[in-house]
Amino acid sequence: MPKSTDIKSILILGAGPIVIGQACEFDYSGTQACKALKEEGYRIILLNSNPATIMTDPDMADATYVEPIHWEIVEKIIQKEKPDALLPTMGGQTALNCALELDHKGILKKYGVQIIGATVDAIKKAENRKLFEHSMKKLNLETAKCGIAHNIQEAFLVLNNVGFPCIIRPSFTMGGHGGGIAYNHEEFEKICERGLELSPSTELLIDESLIGWKEYEMEVVRDKNDNCIIVCSIENLDPMGIHTGDSITVAPAQTLTDKEYQVMRNASMSILREIGVETGGSNVQFAINPKNGRMIVIEMNPRVSRSSALASKATGFPIAKIAAKLAIGYTLDELANDITGTNTTASFEPSIDYIVTKIPRFNFEKFPGCDDRLTTQMKSVGEVMAIGRTFQESIQKAIRGLEVGASGFDSKISSRDSEYLIKIRRELKDAGSERIWYIGDAFRYGMSINDVFDLTSIDPWFLVQIKEIILLEKKIIKNGFIGLKYDFFYFLKRKGFSDQRIAILTNKNESEIRQLRYKLNLHPVYKRIDTCSAEFSTETAYMYSTWEDECESHPSKNNKKIIILGGGPNRIGQGIEFDYCCVHAAQALREDGFEAIMVNCNPETVSTDYDISDRLYFEPITLENVLEIVRIEKPKGVIIQYGGQTPLKLAHEFEKEGVPIIGTSPDSIDTAENRYRFQKTVNKLRLQQPLNATVLTLDEAYKKADIIGYPIMVRPSYVLGGRAMEIVYEPYGLENYFKTTLKKNNTTPILLDQYLDYATEVDVDAICDGETVLIGGIMEHIEQAGVHSGDSACSLPAYTLTSKVQNEIRRQVKKLAFELSVKGLMNIQFAIKNNKIYIIEVNPRAARTVPFVSKAIGLALAKISVRVMCGKTLLEQGFIKEIIPPYFSVKEAVLPFDKFQGVDPILGPEMRSTGEVMGIGKNFSEAFSKSMLGAHTNMKKSGRVLLSVRNNDKNNIINLAVKLKKLGFKIDATKGTSVALKKSGISSRLVNKVHEGRPHIQDRLKNGEYSYIVNTTSCYQGIKDSKLICRSALQYKVHYDTTVNGAFATVMALNENPIKNIETLQKIHKKIQLFYTKK
């Protein structure tokens, strides 16, 4: 049947900011949905608060709202745009929950808006644990022994039936948020209390323990005629007890018998029918007891998910695109398979002749003190996917793609002391993020398959594969470099061994192994992802490398080829913003007649969609992989400046190997990143930097710190995302840094910088073509200097900087751009103190602020920049004038502290945010209020405020207290702050710090007495107190600020209604055009 004609316009809900459990896979699905429905002629209205997404580009929808995803905002959009239908299945749990709230409040019925993609009843049956269990019983499918609880008393009644250990999962949350495994009454009560707080429906599902069971997932698509297909089966290498998002997964499933697979397949289809998923994609999860084969249904998601993105990239079947078209009435047999063209339709189940492995990426090092053990609550921040002909090839490629410094199954045991076997056993039994390497060590040091299975419950089939890799490593070591004859070398490559890994094992360097391989004429071939195991020819060039005879790459003879290197797996400091730039690069190149070739290994991203570039190589971003692609494609140029540090760190090696890098040269990049070279540049230009020094020892640090003066910023050289950076206020803090943060026998130079307290930090994005510099935007940070730029909110245009200071910033940006010979994008960070401008750092590459600035000013900076890199000047493109919008845009960071209990949540120089939101308003305060709502800031507009600030902030707090009083807040203050307030005639209630006696701050927080907390600190004891306060504020959902500037911005925002004014990005950008036309 053809598409629905009674629908003319569709409102799509996005997923909002990137958070743990809900990442950029929903930008991928949302972008696919927008494109699919727009090409069918529907008017598309989009709501998403995340500016770093491709789906919020103005050309993706007819009306794009970069506003908070909140039911009242959605109602205003419905009133204004009058959509016929709402599609909530592309925006993760955020969109589903919003749709349920709209239905509950009667808004959809009131305005006659129908939900497509999934009915409200289907969402409820899938998400509500009791309804889901009832549905499974009707199908004679088992679920885990469980019970529902809505309070602690009910929870303990369920526990009597379920017993220990048990798994606790809050309803309507994502990524296992708020859940956990309880082994005793104390843990049980703690997890239940937290789960009840986080569940929107105040509901818990308490399950019997399935720890050690095998876990599987089925990606299912169904149409309105009840045609059902299994797109992909996925097997978790890690057993139940570890969240599937934190587990290594393999597709297709490797250890199911055909009978088990068919039972699971049929059950999946029956579940979709019973739940009522009439059209679209769903994910169904199963567990199998390896001892007796008992199968139970864990859960199902009636929407596209993280696994849907993985399955789409693993098979080439675009689940989100197909689901969007099914939602408007098409059937599977009416839709063509984009990969095979007219050869097959979407009703053909994909068949694959390769193995896909996904490995999650963790950032525990960013959260000292957090529990790094893997449980039912998701903790990973990204993932990598690799494709190979065998599991061994696939997993070794995935390990390399992770970018954690591993070339393969590197040993984690540095010396065989008396404890090494105990450590291996502990790491196998109580899984952390590095368990896969400890499995390698277990076999390396003599443990058997059964030993490892008993400790991990990982299926022996996988363990046999890993053990064989370790045995091969021993053989490589034994034979040495001279043993690398053609047949053995070729055999190793087919097993997934990289040049780098072989080099380590033979005690050679990578270039020596590469030269030998070239001499032996050993090169990979490229196979195509075709959905049909090579049964039909493909119309798309979506490829992976392997080691066989026939190559299917078939590169064109086009001499206008450009390779774009992506950013690999998401991590804190390098996320979706860089993928946004890579996608824009591909789009601009294709628009200008270039052949765009993408190289990346992240399955969540838009850049790895097969139709974004002309050719896609799904490969790790390593020297070996990129050189082989360059060899076969022979590009005119390679772009390394858009994928963050991942491709940049290979720049010098590329240059040595003759790779044609376009844009800013590697030498210029090194000048900016090398401390000594950059200092010379700054001095030559007669610009200013904060006082600084480089030291190796603590004694040296004491001496230099005395010269610079406390407080100082301390960090190792060459760090990413502020890694291991700290602000030190006194000699004791310096000693503590050397003892606790640095490894023993540290040989890395330590950088000391003057910390400019009370300085305002400024970010500038600009483009230089060698003749002209285009200022993209001057962003003023809301938190003062010392908070990592990625964690600070910022405003464009600047909201307090004078025009004189801004003009001087512009002058300095231009001088630096020309001196560094920048060709393309650059980002400069400044600190302003007492009207003096200090340069913090310069990055001659794309920065994480590029998407935000592009949305704020209405110019696609990444596209303009890539054209500059390809030889088109700014003048030729018509972009030479800085745009200062006649409205304000605020970018606010979203932090994951609620996922990491016990971590110090005070903001500092080490970046820890996972995502961002954008607020747009007629003035700064309105824009900031919207960004707060978009970031789910729980800010009440009345009640009692706690003020506890350091001595240096006491003068500034007076004005803040006056403003809070005017708003009707009552004030509590700690001793020193209370005295300062009293001197200025402001009354407050005195409250004790924890070490000062009871009742103290913690007691009052537990009693729900506070609506808002302002807490700044400096000294060692103050930091300890502050950590306790902020952690408690998080626990009890009280908004807090740890900088006075942040507090002033919050108070300004309290005067605004973030829901009052909404406008489309298209109209906002039109205002800019009209504004500059009138000028």
From Swiss-Prot:
Residues 937-1079 form the MGS-like domain. Mg(2+) 4 binds at E841, N843. Residues 133-328, 679-870 form the ATP-grasp domain. Residues 554-936 are annotated as: Carbamoyl phosphate synthetic domain. Its EC number is 6.3.4.16, 6.3.5.5. Keywords: Amino-acid biosynthesis, Arginine biosynthesis, ATP-binding, Ligase, Magnesium, Manganese, Metal-binding, Nucleotide-binding, Pyrimidine biosynthesis, Repeat. Composed of two chains; the small (or glutamine) chain promotes the hydrolysis of glutamine to ammonia, which is used by the large (or ammonia) chain to synthesize carbamoyl phosphate. Tetramer of heterodimers (alpha,beta)4. Belongs to the CarB family. The large subunit is composed of 2 ATP-grasp domains that are involved in binding the 2 ATP molecules needed for carbamoyl phosphate synthesis. The N-terminal ATP-grasp domain (referred to as the carboxyphosphate synthetic component) catalyzes the ATP-dependent phosphorylation of hydrogencarbonate to carboxyphosphate and the subsequent nucleophilic attack by ammonia to form a carbamate intermediate. HAMAP family: CPSase_L_chain_B. This is Carbamoyl phosphate synthase large chain. It comes from Buchnera aphidicola subsp. Acyrthosiphon pisum (strain APS) (Acyrthosiphon pisum symbiotic bacterium).
